[in-house]
Amino acid sequence: MVKVTFNSALAQKEAKKDESKSGEEALIIPPDAVAVDCKDPDEVVPVGQRRAWCWCMCFGLAFMLAGVILGGAYLYKYFAFQPDDVYYCGIKYIKDDVILNEPSADAPASRYQTIEENIKIFEEDEVEFISVPVPEFADSDPANIVHDFNKKLTAYLDLNLDKCYVIPLNTSIVMPPKNLLELLINIKAGTYLPQSYLIHEHMVITDRIENIDHLGFYIYRLCHDKETYKLQRRETIKGIQKRSADVCVTIRHFENRFAVETLICP
């Protein structure tokens, strides 16, 4: 009879080899597992910080959109609300308060003065814009004038001094936009109005206006970034009135069937 025996030491050695192989297989980790499971702490963004960044971005976009809308509205009002026609016309008037009774009556040429100006009418907004250029012979000053019937204000911009003057609208002298437009249409074929007379206005400069936002869009556009002052009307008379001081501003214009001389003094 043959007895089969096993070497225990050899069996233990084989068992240890099997355990070491299984251990090596368990320690094998795919290379991409490190990239997925392990991150740099500096690269991790907290959830609260990401939310704050999103809110800031949303508010920034909202402010940008609001600025675009407001800017577009201003540009639309600036460019769209333009008059269809600009009237260039003039008026002849007598230098003194003597008026010719007959249209065909003759008078010395030296007694006539001529006023020429550009007139724009914004009928829907009830605004008149008058541009008085530099006169060739008369001793008056160039100016831009705005009559705003909605705000019931008149603004004068002295182009020599680059200063603005604001006063309540005088409806007894200034013809409403609709009526003035009809008058201009009727005389569009001619260059000058029939001979007329001259009205004198004497105004005094008072307080400075620091904020002109409440004066309306058209006056704001006229007087923006310019020194602006209030005016007080001293008197309105027909006939000759001596100039009180050489420092006064004299503006000759018309927005009616007669001419107006506006004297603005300190």
Curated annotation (Swiss-Prot):
TM spans (from-to): 55-75
Stretches in topological domain Lumenal: 76-266
Pfam families in the cross-refs: BRICHOS
Residues bearing attached sugar chains per UniProt: 170
Location of region: Necessary for interaction with APP and inhibitor effects on APP processing: 102-134
Swiss-Prot/TrEMBL site (Cleavage) positions: 243-244
GO MF, one example: amyloid-beta binding
Database matches in PROSITE patterns: BRICHOS
Residue numbers on the Cytoplasmic membrane side: 1-54
PTM annotation: The ectodomain C-terminal part of the imBRI2 is processed by furin producing a secreted Bri23 peptide and a mature BRI2, membrane form (mBRI2). The remaining part of the ectodomain of mBRI2 containing the BRICHOS domain is cleaved by ADAM10 and is secreted (BRI2C, soluble form). The membrane-bound N-terminal fragment (BRI2C, membrane form) is further proteolytically processed by SPPL2A and SPPL2B through regulated intramembrane proteolysis producing a secreted C-peptide and a BRI2 intracellular domain (BRI2 ICD) released in the cytosol.
Matches recorded under InterPro entries: BRICHOS_dom, ITM2
Domain of life per record: Eukaryota
GO cellular component: endosome membrane; extracellular space; Golgi apparatus; Golgi membrane; Golgi-associated vesicle membrane; organelle membrane; plasma membrane
GO biological process, one term: negative regulation of amyloid precursor protein biosynthetic process
Keyword Transmembrane applies: yes
Disulfide topology: 164-223, 248-265
Alphabetically ordered keywords of this record: Cell membrane, Disulfide bond, Endosome, Glycoprotein, Golgi apparatus, Membrane, Secreted, Signal-anchor, Transmembrane, Transmembrane helix
The BRICHOS domain, residue ranges: 137-231
Subunit relationships: Homodimer; disulfide-linked. Interacts with SPPL2A and SPPL2B. Interacts with APP. Mature BRI2 (mBRI2) interacts with the APP amyloid-beta A4 protein; the interaction occurs at the cell surface and in the endocytic compartments and enable alpha- and beta-secretase-induced APP cleavage inhibition. Mature BRI2 (mBRI2) interacts with the APP C99; the interaction occurs in the endocytic compartments and enable gamma-secretase-induced C99 cleavage inhibition. May form heterodimers with Bri23 peptide and APP amyloid-beta protein 40.
Record-linked PANTHER family: INTEGRAL MEMBRANE PROTEIN 2B (PTHR10962:SF4), INTEGRAL TRANSMEMBRANE PROTEIN 2 (PTHR10962)
Entry's family note: Belongs to the ITM2 family.
Annotated function: Plays a regulatory role in the processing of the amyloid-beta A4 precursor protein (APP) and acts as an inhibitor of the amyloid-beta peptide aggregation and fibrils deposition. Plays a role in the induction of neurite outgrowth. Functions as a protease inhibitor by blocking access of secretases to APP cleavage sites. Mature BRI2 (mBRI2) functions as a modulator of the amyloid-beta A4 precursor protein (APP) processing leading to a strong reduction in the secretion of secretase-processed amyloid-beta protein 40 and amyloid-beta protein 42.
Protein name: Integral membrane protein 2B
Organism: Bos taurus
Lineage: Eukaryota, Metazoa, Chordata, Craniata, Vertebrata
Gene, per the UniProt record: ITM2B
